[in-house]
Regions:
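Long, well-ordered core segments of solenoidal/helical folds
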Residues: 13-14, 60-61, 65
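Hydrophobic core segments within long, regular secondary-structure runs in both alpha-
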Residues: 10-14, 268
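Divalent-metal (Mg2+/Mn2+/Ca2+)-assisted nucleotide/phosphate chemistry catalytic cores
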Residues: 1, 12, 35
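Catalytic loop of the DD-peptidase/beta-lactamase superfamily, centered on the K-T-G motif
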Residues: 25, 42-60, 68, 72-275
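Short, small-residue-biased leader/transition segments that mark boundaries at the very start
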Residues: 2-7
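Hydrophobic mid-domain F-helix/FG-region of cytochrome P450s
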Residues: 32-43
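Cytochrome P450 catalytic-domain "roof"
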Residues: 15-24
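Cytochrome P450
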Residues: 23-32
Length: 275
């Protein structure tokens, strides 16, 4: 059957009460964050977040990145080669074993996979039952690519991502055009919340206003003054305020969980060797 890939009832999201008392825990909003921010943009400016980004950022600064693709974009978009949606044998074993047999870190992974927070962030929002699996080719469908799902389906090139973060790393302006004020960048990249994150396996993620300021296991946080975001398949983009440089890595073949950010980590290390 056709699965709903995005929220269509914004009022339902607006009526949703916090799952936990605000300020008591940190829980990653895998999909809903983009709709919440996008609705603010739409009500203030009148344009959708995808249209606003296209007209005010992508076109003005020559950044090859879109939220909601047109036919021309689709014609040059690489297909994603995702891992099977079914739990692999190792995960199945972890879920089946009693907790007293598991190391503490593996126990945390198991508890997170079984938790309501994980299901709400990654499964229920996509209307997928925890016993179901999405078809592995759903990100390659035209309906997914054309939709505006700001927190999940932005499409772009590594150079486009690097250019975006490079502009932010250099003060927010380029060629006499301003993307963001330096004070706004400083505020947005100052940690506002810190893990352990109840969705992201209790890892000590640090978030600013949308940006990851420290993302364990990835390049983000290996140096002072870094901010950016990681992707579910292993993609990574970040800015380094101290070195005034942007970084972008994209991959169309999803990396396994144990090697998720291995390539971006290796590339980032080489970058800093050069710098």
């Amino acid at each position: 059957r056709q699965r709903q890939m995005c929220i269509r009832d914004r009022d339902k999201l607006a009526r949703q009460e916090p799952i936990r008392e605000p300020g008591t825990t940190q829980g990653y909003h895998a999909v809903t964050f983009g709709y919440l921010v996008g609705e603010l943009v739409r009500r203030i400016d009148g344009r959708s977040l995808g249209t606003y980004f296209k007209e005010e950022i992508a076109e003005k600064f020559g950044i090859d990145f879109v939220i909601g693709m047109n036919e021309e974009d689709i014609s040059r978009c690489a297909d994603l080669l995702l891992l099977s949606g079914k739990p692999n044998l190792l995960i199945q074993m972890v879920l089946a074993l009693p907790n007293w047999l598991l190391p503490e870190q593996i126990k945390i992974v198991k508890q997170t996979l079984q938790s309501k927070e994980y299901a709400k962030a990654f499964l229920e929002i996509m209307e997928v039952d925890e016993n179901e699996t999405l078809p592995t080719d759903y990100p390659n469908s035209d309906s997914w690519r054309k939709a505006e799902i700001p927190a999940a389906n932005g499409h772009g090139t590594a150079s486009g991502i690097a250019k975006f973060f490079g502009i932010l790393a250099s003060g927010g302006s380029r060629n006499s055009q301003k993307m963001l004020n330096p004070d706004t960048i400083k505020d947005a990249t100052t940690p506002k919340t810190t893990g352990p994150d109840v969705v992201l396996f209790q890892a000590p993620y640090k978030f600013g206003l949308g940006y990851q300021v420290d993302a364990p296991f990835s390049p983000i946080g290996m140096k002072e003054g870094m901010f950016g975001h990681t992707g579910i398949a292993g993609a990574t983009g970040f800015a380094d305020l101290n070195h005034k440089v942007g970084f972008g890595f994209t991959n169309n073949r999803q990396h396994s969980l144990g090697k998720l950010y291995r390539t971006s980590n290796n590339l980032a290390k080489k970058l800093y060797e050069i710098l």
